[in-house]
């Protein structure tokens, strides 16, 4: 399965949630996508379908392919603690996600591009792997003398919503990954236990 590059609103309408960005439009059009969306009722899903849907929602939210997502899940399962909560912590610890959370990029997709194009550093070293897993204490910044440094800096808009597991220095355009987040602090509406049940079959 290739990474989805189509309209973001279509994905959000499928799930009935603003999982890919701003959801103000949902108040105007929350119908399923398609020609007859307004006349279609959302089906009552069975157990397996609900589990699969939740996995797809998580993959679309964080922009992962199946292989990447399964690898992250397997790592979560190996760690001590609750597997579902570990999964969310690892997804949040991804470099591309953290660049997005800090407000350096307007979306996870844009954050992924910044990382891939070598504009992001971790502890002063360039890291161009979006899936790079941060550890508490890691400092995220922009590459010195980056060709797009000024344009990126000018586009940075610190988020009104603050996340207690990261800290952002607006003046230096640097962020610190303070700790792995507690599940209740992560705003995404993902029922991770359904994903655990799906992969446990």
Language model segments and positions:
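Beta-rich strand-turn-strand
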Residues: 105-108
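Glycine- and Gly-Pro-enriched alpha-helical subdomains that act as flexible
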Residues: 118-121, 126-128
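Short, well-ordered loop/turn sites that connect or cap secondary structure elements
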Residues: 114-115, 134
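Ferredoxin-like alpha/beta domains used as RNA- or RNAP-binding modules
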Residues: 1-102, 129-201
């Amino acid at each position: 399965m290739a990474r989805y590059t189509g309209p973001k609103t279509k994905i959000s309408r499928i799930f009935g949630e603003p999982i890919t960005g701003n959801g103000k439009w949902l108040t105007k059009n929350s119908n399923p996508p398609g020609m007859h969306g307004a006349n279609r009722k959302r089906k009552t899903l069975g157990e397996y379908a609900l589990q699969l849907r939740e996995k797809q929602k998580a993959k679309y939210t964080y922009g992962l392919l199946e292989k990447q997502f399964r690898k992250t899940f397997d790592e979560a399962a190996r760690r001590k603690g609750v597997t579902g909560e570990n999964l969310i912590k690892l997804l949040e610890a991804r470099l591309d996600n953290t660049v997005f959370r800090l407000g350096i990029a307007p979306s996870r997709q844009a954050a992924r591009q910044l990382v891939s194009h070598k504009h992001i550093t971790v502890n002063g070293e360039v890291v161009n792997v979006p899936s790079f897993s941060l550890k508490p204490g890691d400092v995220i910044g922009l590459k010195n003398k980056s060709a797009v440094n000024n344009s990126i800096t000018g586009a940075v808009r610190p988020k009104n919503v603050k996340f207690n597991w990261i800290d952002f220095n607006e003046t230096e355009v640097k962020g610190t990954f303070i700790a792995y987040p507690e599940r209740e602090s992560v705003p995404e509406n993902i029922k991770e236990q359904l994903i655990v049940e799906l992969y446990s079959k």
